A protein has these predicted regions:
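Short linear motifs in intrinsically disordered/low-complexity regions
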Residues: 7-9, 24, 37-39, 45, ...
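Negatively charged, low-complexity tracts enriched in Asp/Glu with abundant Ser/Thr
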Residues: 1-31
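Mixed-charge, Lys/Arg-enriched low-complexity segments
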Residues: 2, 51-95
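Intrinsic disorder/low-complexity signal
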Residues: 10-14, 49, 61
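A short, structured beta-strand/loop element
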Residues: 37-59
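A positively charged, amphipathic N-terminal helix/segment that binds anionic biomolecules
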Residues: 22-38, 88, 93
């Protein structure tokens, strides 16, 4: 997983999933990024948690370059109701 800081990165949403419970809304976004410096597409995940009091978010960049794997990881994350605080720990276990 890389941190993408290049201002010329192009992003495109692949899939989004939102689930709401009593006091929290979790939104999962799978997206592709294409960096101008190498032009290769990579897949990244964002998890956002919204409550009445705050919004927190975590993004894991460049988790894979294969669409099939990205969708599989995305579905595992959404089924497990992963939060922004646990995103990197969970990805570390499944990657």
């Amino acid at each position: 997983m890389k941190s993408m800081t290049n201002a010329n990165v192009k992003e495109e949403t692949v899939e989004t999933y939102t689930i709401e419970a009593e006091n929290i809304r979790l939104t999962y976004t799978l997206f592709t990024s294409t960096a101008d410096y190498d032009g290769r597409k990579c897949y990244s995940l964002t998890v956002t948690a919204e409550t009445d009091d705050e919004i927190t978010s975590s993004t894991a960049h460049d988790i894979t370059r294969r669409r099939k794997d990205a969708i599989r990881y995305f579905r595992m994350i959404t089924r497990g109701l992963v939060t922004p605080c646990t995103l990197f720990d969970v990805l570390e276990n499944i990657l």
